[in-house]
């Protein structure tokens, strides 16, 4: 395994928050940090007429998150236990295929903008939950996940050279606390896919050897081969900015897509969607397969027709792959509406849509 890259990118471990530098090219990039290349006056006028779409699935997820967070803040531990048990038993999904049990735990996470006292207050609730339910796998996983998030909060997002010894010590200490909770709860009779989710995040932060990380991934997918977050986490760890070499994550994505009992091409597409912000021109700068991605997108659209995000992602990725016909099909479905979570800049949406319709870049 490659040495850790100076811990300079630790802040992006949990979610894909930043994009690559935009490159001047005649093909699309997923980055929205700069201006939109080659846009003309007509496209700017078209962009001004666009409407922000509201994804009903995202609304559903937000409502679920708010309710679970309210239960946590009100210390309704019995209700939390009942909800988590039901989500595990039913393997319930939102209408975009995301797992409700994962969002259950995400609901308790604090924001980086919140003061330290808010984190300490949350820690106290977690401890009360464990005291009230000492044999609960749910309470243990929630606390471990809290420690992982608290570690990144304490450390900050700067380069290693900007992190004080005290901050780095606190970071390592909290990751170790997360690992201790995970070890303690590992043999609990009830299992939860989020246990491996948190364990993999901890392992990445601690820089586990490849063989240990791979063993953990194998355990995770053996327990629940359709819990797509595990395969995404492994692919993410194989980015060149982490522990991989060029082509590593792409090879893993194909392996995950071919796994018996898994999600097939859908898994490949989910990995590409998750990593696109890190790879600039996805289908020019990497070995990612557009045919396999497109196959997965088609599966996602068939299974989850209510998700506007999937259509927006398909439109964006088709443009990046210069598949004009498929891009046009997706943009035609979207009309004059766009999802800001996929297209932060309406000008980019208008520019890409115009290319799909006319072939003019």
Can you say where each PLM-predicted feature lies in the sequence?
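Bacterial signal peptide processing site
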Residues: 20-23
């Amino acid at each position: 395994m490659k040495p850790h890259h100076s811990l300079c990118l630790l802040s992006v471990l949990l979610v894909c928050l930043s994009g690559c530098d935009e490159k001047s090219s005649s093909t699309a990039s997923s980055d929205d940090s700069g201006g939109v290349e080659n846009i003309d006056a007509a496209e700017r006028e078209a962009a001004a007429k666009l409407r922000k779409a509201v994804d009903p699935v995202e609304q559903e997820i937000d409502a679920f998150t708010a309710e679970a967070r309210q239960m946590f803040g009100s210390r309704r531990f019995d209700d939390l236990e009942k909800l988590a048990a039901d989500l595990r038993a039913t393997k319930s999904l939102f209408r975009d295929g995301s797992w409700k049990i994962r969002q259950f735990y995400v609901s308790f996470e604090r924001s980086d903008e919140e003061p330290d006292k808010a984190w300490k207050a949350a820690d106290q609730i977690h401890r009360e939950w464990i005291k009230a339910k000492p044999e609960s796998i749910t309470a243990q996983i929630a606390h471990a996940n809290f420690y992982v998030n608290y570690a990144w909060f304490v450390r900050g997002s700067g380069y290693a050279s900007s992190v004080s010894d005290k901050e780095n010590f606190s970071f390592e200490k909290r990751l170790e606390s997360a690992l201790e909770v995970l070890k303690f709860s590992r043999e609990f009779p009830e299992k939860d896919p989020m246990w491996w989710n948190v364990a993999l995040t901890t392992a990445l932060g601690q820089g586990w050897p490849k063989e240990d990380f791979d063993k953990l991934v194998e355990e995770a997918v053996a327990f629940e081969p359709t819990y797509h977050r595990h395969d995404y986490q492994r692919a993410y760890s194989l980015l060149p900015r982490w522990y991989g070499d060029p082509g590593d994550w792409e090879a893993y994505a194909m392996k995950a897509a071919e796994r018996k009992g898994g999600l097939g091409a859908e898994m490949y597409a989910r990995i590409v969607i998750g990593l696109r912000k890190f790879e600039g021109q996805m289908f020019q700068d990497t070995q990612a397969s557009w045919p396999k991605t497109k196959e997965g997108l088609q599966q996602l659209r068939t299974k989850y027709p209510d998700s506007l995000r999937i259509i927006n992602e398909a439109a964006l990725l088709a443009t990046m792959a210069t598949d004009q016909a498929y891009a046009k099909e997706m943009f035609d479905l979207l009309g004059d509406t766009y999802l800001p979570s996929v297209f932060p800049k309406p000008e980019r949406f208008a520019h890409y849509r115009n290319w799909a319709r006319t072939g003019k870049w």
